């Protein structure tokens, strides 16, 4: 199933940007996923193509207008009535591997990128938007966050990453833990050596070492992820 992604933005020239490179870009060229970028400004009715205005009640900055954004959303819905609506927002649910995986099951998603001080709340009240955040910090707009979301989803689609084992072994996928350390040639570099176990050829012991390292790193750096794991098998 092809994933079709619609992006609503006032800066359409930002796309595909980084999404045109590496495995994500190759998947785009192969049609494994499609990108449709919609310029919100093109739906403004005045000669200046105004997309923002001062907030009611006062306050700093400008707010993106509901009538303009609504027209852009209606255009998308007229062609894809079942599209999954997503708004990139610091108030949203924090993006994780599970959410990325769930979104790949949709054939069509639409991502709204805000700017300025945000969008008129009535957009979220009128439409069925799912708000997603990529972290507890603020960006100047939703476009970069949107790219993070798209890449996190697309790389999970079968056929995008050639070695599917890479996805199975990486952080947050295997038992919801952080990934174990990785090494490659040379075996010795500036006085630092690759752990002997990785050079032993004993795959049973190597796999146990990887599991142990993954658990220990997760316990140290993200202890909340290990709450449901029986650590006795790793220690």
From Swiss-Prot:
Catalytic activities: guanosine(37) in tRNA + S-adenosyl-L-methionine = N(1)-methylguanosine(37) in tRNA + S-adenosyl-L-homocysteine + H(+)
Keywords assigned by UniProt, alphabetized: Cytoplasm, Methyltransferase, S-adenosyl-L-methionine, Transferase, tRNA processing
EC numbers for this chain: 2.1.1.228
Keyword check for Ribosomal protein: no
GO molecular function per UniProt: tRNA (guanine(37)-N1)-methyltransferase activity
Function: Specifically methylates guanosine-37 in various tRNAs.
Full protein name: tRNA (guanine-N(1)-)-methyltransferase
Organism of derivation: Ehrlichia canis (strain Jake)
Protein's gene: trmD
């Amino acid at each position: 199933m092809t994933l079709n992604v619609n992006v609503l933005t006032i800066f359409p020239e930002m796309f595909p940007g980084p999404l045109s490179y590496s495995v994500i870009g190759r998947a785009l060229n192969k049609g494994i996923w499609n990108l449709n970028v919609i310029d919100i400004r093109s739906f403004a009715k005045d000669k200046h193509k105004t997309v923002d205005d001062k907030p009611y009640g006062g306050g700093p900055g400008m707010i993106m207008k509901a009538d303009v954004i609504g027209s852009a959303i209606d255009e998308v819905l007229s062609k894809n009535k079942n599209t999954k609506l997503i708004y990139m927002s610091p108030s949203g649910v924090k993006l994780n591997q599970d959410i990325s995986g769930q979104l790949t099951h949709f054939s069509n998603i639409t991502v709204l990128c805000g700017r300025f001080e945000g969008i008129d709340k009535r957009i979220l009240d009128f439409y069925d938007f799912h708000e997603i955040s990529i972290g507890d910090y603020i960006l100047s707009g939703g476009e970069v966050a949107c790219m993070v979301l798209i890449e996190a989803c697309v790389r999970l689609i079968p056929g995008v990453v050639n070695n599917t084992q890479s996805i199975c072994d990486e952080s947050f996928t295997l038992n919801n833990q952080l990934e174990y350390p990785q090494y490659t040639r040379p075996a010795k570099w500036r006085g630092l050596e690759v752990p002997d176990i990785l050079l032993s050829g004993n795959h049973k012991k190597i796999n146990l070492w990887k599991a142990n390292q993954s658990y220990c790193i997760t316990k140290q750096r993200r202890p909340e992820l290990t709450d449901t794991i029986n650590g006795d098998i790793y220690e």
